[in-house]
Curated annotation (Swiss-Prot):
Record-stated family: Belongs to the argininosuccinate synthase family. Type 1 subfamily.
Subunit structure comment from the entry: Homotetramer.
Signal peptide positions (record): none
Name this protein carries in UniProt: Argininosuccinate synthase
Compartments in which it is found: Cytoplasm
Name of the encoding gene: argG
UniProt key word Ligase: yes
Binding-site list for L-aspartate: 121, 125-126
Species: Prochlorococcus marinus (strain MIT 9215)
Pathway: Amino-acid biosynthesis; L-arginine biosynthesis; L-arginine from L-ornithine and carbamoyl phosphate: step 2/3
Positions bound to ATP: 10-18, 38, 119
Keywords: Amino-acid biosynthesis, Arginine biosynthesis, ATP-binding, Cytoplasm, Ligase, Nucleotide-binding
SUPFAM superfamilies hit by this protein: Adenine nucleotide alpha hydrolases-like (SSF52402), Argininosuccinate synthetase, C-terminal domain (SSF69864)
Length: 404
């Protein structure tokens, strides 16, 4: 196999990716490591992270602002898909991986690199997402995965990094693994590995506790056009602004925490903690608006599509033919998803209290009402029921037991 001379490394500044830099150079004999830091709205000082990569031995360190692309190309399609893996997790972390992988491949092309690398461990989901996306976009590129091969625990990786002057950003006694982007935070490891251990309050940053959330409810309205959120409380916003505002409103009222047992791609169950206040709020509102603007059979079948969409994105198949086909179906359903949804935020809850669509509502007052304005033809119900239940009645007559 040809010796790799230049590699592009997905870099976060955390333990694993920081240790990857000296490890790639020392153990793999790679002469040039270029790091890529993705700005996904995580709120960190990315210039410090870029400098840390250079101090750790990177020949170049690139920061890419991907926030707009992340929201418009990844988060908003997930909202249209009502994407909830295992009916709970809105894919806040999973959505970022194919975007990062896409940029890794582009940078590798730009700098004529032989390979790309990431710091994912051998039993996580991200390794699958990165590898599948890279193979789809750059099948000729070699993928190097040091953390999958070095057999070091997190504590040992911290010690290895310290030998090369790399400071660890976590406590050795409580090494939580935290991933942050504009859509939310994921927290794992440490005492959270005990599924009966309550998550300590100090791990949360985007959401208030129930005790600290306001004692008065807040009613908000979310506006949609073609299935995309476009405004909150009559204020029309950019996609990024909508996510930010939804995060603040929902998070302040304690909505958006997820504590779940998750079925990982590699076959194990893991305990995961997520904070995704804005994304969960927008998905909830979008799904509610669909209930008044889509035909029942579309809603029913779209539910099947949504589940599959969430599964394949979680499993790493963002760049694939099935995902493209599901996207096409979802997109075809969204032209009528226009209107607004009223939600009450209170003490960890987001309660739908109203929904309307001026031009696309399938709800008709004159058919739904029980008042004198009712135009529903009640007399036709008997014939409908007779035909609707015919097959069941025939079965019952055939199988009923008669008594003398």
């Amino acid at each position: 196999m040809q010796q790799v001379k230049k590699v592009v490394l997905a870099y976060s500044g955390g333990v694993d990716t920081s240790v990857c830099i000296p490890y790639l150079k020392k153990e793999y004999g790679i002469s040039e490591v270029i790091t890529f830091v993705a700005d996904l709205g995580q709120g960190e000082d990315l210039e410090l992270i870029r400098q840390k990569a250079l101090n750790s031995g990177a020949s170049q360190s690139i920061v890419g602002n991907l926030v707009n692309s992340f929201v418009e190309r990844y988060a908003f399609p997930a909202i249209r898909a009502n994407a909830l893996y295992l009916d709970k997790y809105p894919l806040s972390t999973a959505l970022a991986r194919p975007l990062i992988a896409e940029n890794l491949v582009n940078i590798a092309r730009e700098f004529s690199a032989d390979a790309v690398a990431h710091g994912c461990t051998g039993k996580g989901n991200d390794q699958v997402r990165f590898d599948l996306a890279i193979n789809a976009l750059g099948p000729d590129l070699k993928i190097i995965t040091p953390a999958r091969e070095w057999n070091m625990s997190r504590e040992e990786a911290i010690i290895y990094g310290e030998k090369f002057g790399i400071p660890a950003p976590v406590s050795k006694k409580s090494p939580y693994s935290i991933d942050v982007n504009l859509l939310g935070r994921s927290i794992e490891a440490g005492i959270l590995e005990d599924p009966m251990q309550e998550a300590p309050e100090d791990i949360f940053a985007m959401t208030s506790s129930i005790d600290n959330s306001p004692d008065s409810p807040l009613d908000i309205e979310i506006i949609f056009k073609n299935g995309f959120p476009v405004g909150i409380n009559d204020e029309f916003l950019t996609p990024v602004e909508i996510i930010k505002k939804a995060n603040v409103l929902a998070g302040e009222h304690g909505y958006g925490r997820i504590d779940m047992i998750e079925d990982r791609v590699v076959g194990i169950k893991s305990r995961e903690i997520y904070e995704t206040p804005g994304l969960l709020l927008l998905i909830k509102a979008h799904k509610e608006l669909e209930s008044i603007t889509l035909n029942p059979d579309i809603v029913d079948f779209k539910g099947i599509v949504e589940k599959k969409w969430g599964q394949i994105v979680y499993q790493g198949f963002w760049f694939g033919p099935l995902k493209d086909s599901l996207d096409a179906f979802i997109s075809s359903t969204q032209t009528s998803v226009n209107g607004r949804v009223k939600i009450r935020l209170y003490k960890g809850n987001a309660i739908v209290i109203g929904r309307m669509s001026e031009n696309n509502s399938l709800y008709r007052d004159d058919l739904a009402t029980y008042s004198k304005d009712d135009v529903f033809k009640h007399s036709l119900a008997e014939g409908f029921i007779y035909m609707w239940g015919m097959s069941n009645k025939i079965w019952a007559e055939l199988n009923s037991k008669t008594t003398d």
